[in-house]
Amino acid sequence: MSLKKSPFFELRSGSVDTLLFTVKTTDLDALRAELVKRFEATPEFFADDVVAIDVRRLADGERVALADIRQMLNDVRMRPVGVVALATQGWAGEAGLPLLEARDRRAPAAKPADEAEPAAVPAVETAAAPAAAAAPEQPSEPAPTLVQAGGQTLVIDRPLRSGQQIYAKGDLVVLAPVSHGAEIIAEGNIHIYAPLRGRALAGVHGNHDARIFCTCLEPELISIAGIYRTTENPLPADVLGKSVQIRLEEEKLMIEPLRLT
């Protein structure tokens, strides 16, 4: 076999970031209902994002129909690309998806039966659930936060950390940083008077007149009425990290510098 380098292709080691969809229940009906609830307001939020199904949090002896979970994720427009499992979960390779090795911290061992969360309560690490559904497992990891306002302006004056989510039925005003992995969603306009490093979605019910205003734009994703842009398409230097307004014009996101003086 020739070892001469080909001018047409190259094979080399590398790594690709994906979302982890961590399954914590074998009740697929409850899991499906939670997914629908999570994405019904923002169906475009993770559209076309690649995701790995993580089953390491299931208790010893538990197993799920990965083909069904794969279809659930397809139904919400996510793209399952593999499965992350423990060495003892040999069944995880039966779904036709490749087994992947995650480089995150190792999943904690399952709780004893008398301490475990009820199986009927679904939980997904990427989903935001009401605070009463489950207590955070580790104090260092913030629980997802969902705040709804009945049509009026919602003001948030605390920093938002990874995994936290804010949802406003009207306009949303944020006075503190939005970290990577945090999500702010509004049916109206979004105003951020701090760095935006997470995701911001305005006009999520199809309000094409909604706008996003930000004093320091460094986002993972921005979206208005389902039209979105991610960091895969780098922002121009004249708006990256700057004060901007974002609006829609003929189904295209317009990102414009704000003149504050």
Curated annotation (Swiss-Prot):
Keyword vocabulary terms for this entry: Cell cycle, Cell division, Septation
Record flagged with keyword Transit peptide: no
One Pfam entry name: MinC_N
Stretches the record annotates as Disordered: 106-145
Compositionally biased intervals (Low complexity): 118-144
Family matches, as InterPro entries: CAP/MinC_C, MinC, MinC_C_sf, MinC_N, Septum_form_inhib_MinC_C
Entry keyword Glycoprotein: no
NCBIfam families per UniProt: minC (TIGR01222)
Assembly: Interacts with MinD and FtsZ.
Primary role: Cell division inhibitor that blocks the formation of polar Z ring septums. Rapidly oscillates between the poles of the cell to destabilize FtsZ filaments that have formed before they mature into polar Z rings. Prevents FtsZ polymerization.
Name of protein: Probable septum site-determining protein MinC
UniProt organism field: Burkholderia cenocepacia (strain HI2424)
